[in-house]
Design a protein with these regions (language model features):
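Conserved SAM-binding motif I beta-strand of class I
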Residues: 100-105
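Short glycine-dipeptide loop
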Residues: 180, 185-192
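Mobile active-site "lid"/loop adjacent to the S-adenosyl-L-methionine
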Residues: 108-110, 132-136, 149-180
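C-terminal catalytic and target-recognition region of SAM-dependent MTase-like enzymes
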Residues: 189-248
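Conserved SAM-binding loop of SAM-dependent methyltransferases across substrates and taxa
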Residues: 87-99
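Non-catalytic substrate-recognition/targeting regions of SAM-dependent transferases
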Residues: 1-56, 65
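S-adenosyl-L-methionine
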Residues: 107-153
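Conserved class I S-adenosyl-L-methionine
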Residues: 75-86
Length: 248
């Protein structure tokens, strides 16, 4: 284990204990039921869940900064589709940058949480469409409707179920889903972002899939590991990978 020399470890507010059977539970010392954290102009409401999450993946801030800059300098309205959108970090970042956003997640509770984050961030009246839906079925319906988006963000879980029990396994489904999503890209797409927290989807794999499926748009692809810097050691705590396609 990494030596825990920082004095903050002696005053931690909570400790998540993993179970050998899967899952785990929190041990609370001095932790409120809910608290807020700020990133630039965004405010997020956090609370602990039995599956370890607190409602935010802070390592995604590097992606928020990247696509926010692209949206701000696009000189046109950008329609963004955020799939598996969780508590709305990417949704709020895109909306704050001036985009018109469609936020889709299969969990009603997560969409409600994302709306609360929007209110806390001063984005209550931003052009965000909130949808509780199975992401694959939503995209299939958008294809039939003829709707298109200038940018797509997806943060798929390793494993999940839709509102009606639809099963999602990322290794089996992600490539075909990326291909499906290209059918709702506009004629002048700005970017396409895929996040992965599964070890089997390394940056090279994300690069291959994005390069293959978005070849007709003649953009550039960059994939990389993302993580959180550890102040004490100077090391980076690995937190998954991101694949970015962007227009030239």
């Amino acid at each position: 284990d990494t030596p825990k020399k920082n004095r903050g470890w002696k005053h931690m507010n909570g400790h998540y204990h993993r179970s050998k059977k899967g899952g785990g539970e929190w041990e609370f010392f001095d932790l409120p039921k809910q608290w807020q954290i700020h990133y630039k102009d965004l405010t997020f409401n956090l609370k602990p869940f039995n599956f370890k999450h607190t409602g935010l993946f802070p390592e995604q801030a590097t992606n928020w900064d990247w696509f926010s800059d692209k949206i701000k300098h696009a000189d046109r309205e950008i329609r963004v589709l955020n799939l598996f959108a969780y508590t709305g970090g990417a949704t709020l970042a895109a909306a704050a940058a001036g985009a018109k956003v469609t936020h889709v997640d299969a969990s009603k509770g997560m969409v409600t949480w994302a709306k609360e984050n929007a209110v806390s961030s001063g984005l209550k009246d931003a052009p965000i469409r909130w949808l509780v839906d199975d992401c694959v079925k939503f995209v299939e319906r958008e294809i039939r409707r003829g709707n298109h988006y200038d940018a797509i963000i997806m943060d798929p879980p390793s494993y999940g179920r839709g509102p009606k029990g639809e099963i999602w396994k990322i290794e089996d489904s992600i490539h075909s889903f990326i291909k499906l999503c290209t059918k709702i890209l506009s004629d002048d797409p700005l970017f396409f972002l895929v996040n992965s927290y599964t070890t089997g989807l390394a940056p090279a794999v994300l690069t291959y899939m994005l390069s293959t499926e978005l070849a007709p748009w003649n953009g550039t692809v960059e994939s990389q590991e993302i993580g959180l810097p550890v102040t004490e050691s100077g090391l980076i705590l690995p937190c998954g990978a991101s694949g970015r396609w962007e227009a030239k």
